[in-house]
């Protein structure tokens, strides 16, 4: 039997910006430039306290996580009335998405139930790390998208003042190029040499320092 209580602390910060521009060259030609940018940052800390009665242990598990997401979308387009019966519209676009999780840390720690001792971080005693005990995770993803579209409309025959009565031939082309780069690594800290409590009883910020690796 076991009991647990979780405290979850989350902080979100969001930033957004939008910019739209239009250049009207004349009544028959217009150029537009649209941009939108969003960024979201999330910081999360989870502290779990509990008792593992069958093993006679008090547990204190913690995780620290930061994630950042960015999205940029830009579009340059043009609308042109080439003649009374011919219209041309083109759109070029750029999209960028970025997601970063620079250092996700988590660990479990325990002490004998009712002892009042300092918690000791639990480590695997052999060379087989896990993602649950004293682990760190890094990931980064960048994605680029380029798009291009050209559409043309040609009214066939005599133009009717009622648009719905016109016979219209529509042709278009669309192209897209996408490139994605993703990298992820994780490390699990093990204790095959049985280091003493002076290391495993450290505070998380000290335990995860480079001096202990």
Residue ranges and their predicted role:
Residues 19-25, 80-82, 154-156:
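Residue-level signature of outer-membrane beta-barrel architecture
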Residues 1-45, 72:
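Transmembrane beta-barrel wall of Gram-negative outer-membrane proteins
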Residues 115-134, 183-213:
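Flexible glycine-rich, low-complexity coil/linker segments exposed to the extracellular/periplasmic environment
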Residues 27-28, 83-87, 157-168, 184:
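Short loop/turn motifs that connect adjacent beta-strands in outer-membrane beta-barrel proteins
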């Amino acid at each position: 039997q076991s009991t647990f209580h979780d405290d979850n602390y989350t902080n979100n910060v969001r930033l957004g910006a939008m910019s739209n521009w239009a250049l009207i060259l004349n009544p028959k030609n217009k150029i537009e430039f649209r941009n939108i940018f969003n960024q979201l940052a999330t910081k999360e800390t989870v502290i779990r306290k509990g008792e593992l009665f069958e093993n006679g242990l008090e547990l204190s598990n913690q995780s620290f996580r930061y994630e950042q997401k960015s999205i940029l979308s830009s579009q340059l387009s043009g609308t042109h009335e080439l003649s009374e019966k011919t219209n041309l519209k083109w759109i070029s676009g750029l999209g960028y998405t970025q997601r970063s999780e620079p250092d996700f840390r988590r660990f479990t720690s325990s002490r004998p139930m009712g002892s009042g001792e300092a918690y000791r971080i639990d480590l695997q005693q052999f060379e087989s790390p896990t993602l649950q005990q004293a682990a760190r995770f890094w990931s980064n993803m960048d994605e680029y998208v380029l798009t291009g579209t050209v559409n043309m409309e040609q009214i066939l025959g005599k133009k009717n003042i009622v648009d719905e009565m016109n016979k219209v031939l529509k042709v278009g082309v669309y192209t897209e190029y996408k490139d994605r780069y993703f990298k992820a690594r994780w490390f699990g800290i093990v204790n095959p040499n049985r280091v003493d409590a002076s290391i495993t009883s450290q505070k998380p910020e000290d335990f995860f320092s480079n001096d202990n690796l």
